[in-house]
UniProtKB/Swiss-Prot annotation:
Catalytic reactions on record: tRNA(Phe) + L-phenylalanine + ATP = L-phenylalanyl-tRNA(Phe) + AMP + diphosphate + H(+)
GO molecular function: ATP binding; magnesium ion binding; phenylalanine-tRNA ligase activity; tRNA binding
Encoding gene (name): pheS
Species per Swiss-Prot/TrEMBL record: Gluconacetobacter diazotrophicus (strain ATCC 49037 / DSM 5601 / CCUG 37298 / CIP 103539 / LMG 7603 / PAl5)
UniProt keyword Metal-binding, yes or no: yes
Keyword Ligase: yes
Designated name of the protein: Phenylalanine--tRNA ligase alpha subunit
CDD domains: PheRS_alpha_core
Amino acids binding Mg(2+): 260
Cofactor mode of binding and number, as noted: Binds 2 magnesium ions per tetramer.
Cofactor: Mg(2+)
Length: 356
């Protein structure tokens, strides 16, 4: 081998030995075997030689190219192995260290209450229905026999939104989930048996009221429905929810524009101790009544053929009563300590309906 080829071999091997990372290794590879590399330049010179000289010189250059290619590839593999070993050493896990304690989340008490309501009413044959949070004035008020002068329709109680472009129909953030009942009666044939849990909105904010809160309404439409069905349904629900088969339940006359007759539902309660089911006091928990004939007619149902009852309750209120939560605002303060205390385990399903 001529002196220049031996010099190229020694210099390349020395550069490879000095390379410690991919960048330095790649610089040696390109400088030797690349398009402008030193070995490539020697191959280009072969074209200017005589056939006899080209044969001898070409054989020597090709042997050198093969040798250097093997050396470069071998050094590249060594560098990759060293990089991998360094990364594995940095990521090494000490298996003798103690295991980190596991922590689990909790289901928000409002979510759990809605699950329990769905479970209890589901055992009675109800299904869950949903509807939009933004309702038309007609679905939220007019179809429910709410007169134009009713205080609930004022902007002090209701959040009004601009009408859709090209229409004059007013829109509101729904003040109740009753609009779901209207949409169900318009879209389905009786018999109907639904509950409609969801968010509702009213312009009110204090320790017991929130601008956004959750409500669950229910509706039953069928032939021959009477007050006895309403009382039996709600009594069974309240006793199952509060876990007291002997819970005192009282129905007293009231007024709602969409039901006739209308009734408030109270449960036995001790004002002194706050115990549900104990004492001589009564605590109002929900409203109910027989669906007003005008509401049935507004939804295309003949009141002489179809009857029904409806009810509505605040989900936060029932949750506060059962868990002894004093302030409604704490539901939305995102306090992890509070949630750990009042939240439910995600591994514990809502099976209260088994007590019915």
């Amino acid at each position: 081998m001529s002196d220049d080829l031996e010099t190229l071999r020694q210099e390349t091997l020395a550069a490879l030995a000095a390379a410690t990372d991919r960048r330095e290794w790649d610089a040696v590879r390109v400088g030797t075997l690349g398009k402008s590399g030193r070995l490539t330049a020697l191959l280009k010179e072969l074209g200017r030689m005589t056939p006899e000289a080209r044969k001898l010189r070409g054989a020597a250059v090709n042997r050198l190219r093969d040798d250097l290619t093997r050396e470069i590839e071998a050094r590249g593999a060594e560098i990759e192995s060293a990089i991998l070993n360094a990364r594995l050493a940095a990521e090494r896990v000490d298996v003798t260290l103690p295991v980190r304690p596991e922590s689990s989340g909790a289901i928000h008490p409002i979510s759990r209450t809605m699950e329990e309501m769905a479970a209890i009413f589901g055992a009675m044959g109800f299904k869950v229905a949903e509807g939009p949070d933004i309702e038309t004035d007609w679905h939220n008020f007019s179809a429910l026999n709410t007169p134009d002068h009713h205080p609930a329709r004022t902007d002090q109680d209701t959040f009004y939104l601009p009408a859709r472009e090209g229409t004059s129909q007013e829109r509101v953030l729904r003040t109740q989930t009753s609009g779901v009942q209207i949409r169900t009666m318009l879209g389905e044939e009786p018999p109907i048996r639904i509950i409609a849990p969801g968010r509702t909105y009213r312009a009110d904010h204090d320790a017991t009221h929130s601008p956004m809160f959750h409500q669950c309404e229910g509706l039953v439409i069928d032939r021959g429905i009477t007050l006895a069905h309403l009382k039996g349904c709600l009594t069974d629900f309240l006793r199952a929810y509060f876990g007291n088969p002997d819970l005192p339940v009282r129905f007293r006359a009231s007024y709602f524009p969409f039901t006739e007759p209308s009734m408030e539902v109270d449960i036995g309660w001790s004002r002194k101790s706050g115990e549900i089911g104990g004492g001589d006091d009564w605590l109002e928990v929900l409203g109910s009544g027989m669906v007003h004939p005008r509401v049935l007619a507004n939804c295309g149902l003949d009141p002489r053929e179809w009857q029904g009852f409806a009810f509505g309750m605040g989900i936060e209120r029932l949750t506060m009563l059962r868990h002894g939560i004093p302030d409604l605002r704490s539901f939305y303060e995102s306090d992890v300590r509070w949630l750990r205390h009042y939240g439910a385990s995600p591994l514990s399903p809502a099976l209260l309906h088994e007590g019915l």
